[in-house]
């Protein structure tokens, strides 16, 4: 429960962060399908003998090349199979956290027997859509997720409809925190971060705990493209400076290496993405450590980073052709700038420079190479902060950047929401042709 004296708008900010910043084990698109399969299996009478699944093109894009934790295998079929045979239907984005070695073996056997199919849902007007149907003989159960990675809208079995989400908001029901967030500004978010009681936001420190553990695992060098571990080696060899800038990139990319490589550790996600959560967290943690920040300063910086990232991403489709590590890194830029001097002008200049720098980075599906984009975004964020500290930034005379940071954000999000839709279709077409 919230302190009744807390500003009602601030309460909605905190709710937005609590809704959007959650632990997630494994890349969230395959995990969304695994969750649908797990919930369906929980409704089925008897053991699962067959799994059929349908997903949106965007979800297919983000599930083709990513490793499912604990399996050593990539793709949506193993995610669906393991969700059905070893998933925890009540664990949300951590649906696979309790999967046993036996469940993994059973899932692989089901796959090898040709009993698992995943197809693109046609037609499909939803950006994020996953449906899993599990069978035991003639008995079946089907679960549909739409709009959000854990947003179950329909459950049905051979006996009839079990649950259907109501589309309308009940009279007197409060609107979504994200709806409230769509009417705010970065200046209001900064005021909240500066003035909210520490006790109300202490929970955000969990993002540092989880993502630092993932980063440490990534530095072992056995996950994904091991970018973080490789860059750390280059520091030891004298090919890369041992400085704050390198540390930001190394520790951030290491967490993404472990995340995308299939490590069985959760990430603290942001806006439904583990990589976005990592990108919004690790640069801020590294800078906070450099300046010896205490828990309260770290919590305020992390809250600014995560809430700014949510605020920007809320103006985008849930999944798009724009790599959202870039928008999460804009949040990180805000958090790092706040740690250094706390001025709104510095924060807004850093975000504007980010928009002028990495806004063209595409999302070509979840894979080990996401860690490359995470490292690039983290590096760009710190560069933008350093520029802002010297009172320089990409200005409104250049490209899609406007004189006002809010308009710059709106311009970027309009680009991703509209004209980049054709880019997204082309990316999906290219990836589908490779998979044939």
From Swiss-Prot:
Q: Name one Pfam family in it.
A: SDH_alpha
Question: What InterPro entries does the record tag this protein with?
Answer: Ser_deHydtase-like_asu, UPF0597
What are its GO biological-process terms? L-cysteine catabolic process to pyruvate
Annotated organism of origin: Escherichia coli (strain SE11)
| Any GO molecular function | L-cysteine desulfhydrase activity
**Name of the coding gene:** yhaM
Q: Please give the superkingdom of this protein's source.
A: Bacteria
The record's similarity note reads: Belongs to the UPF0597 family.
The entry's protein name is UPF0597 protein YhaM
Signal peptide segment:
none
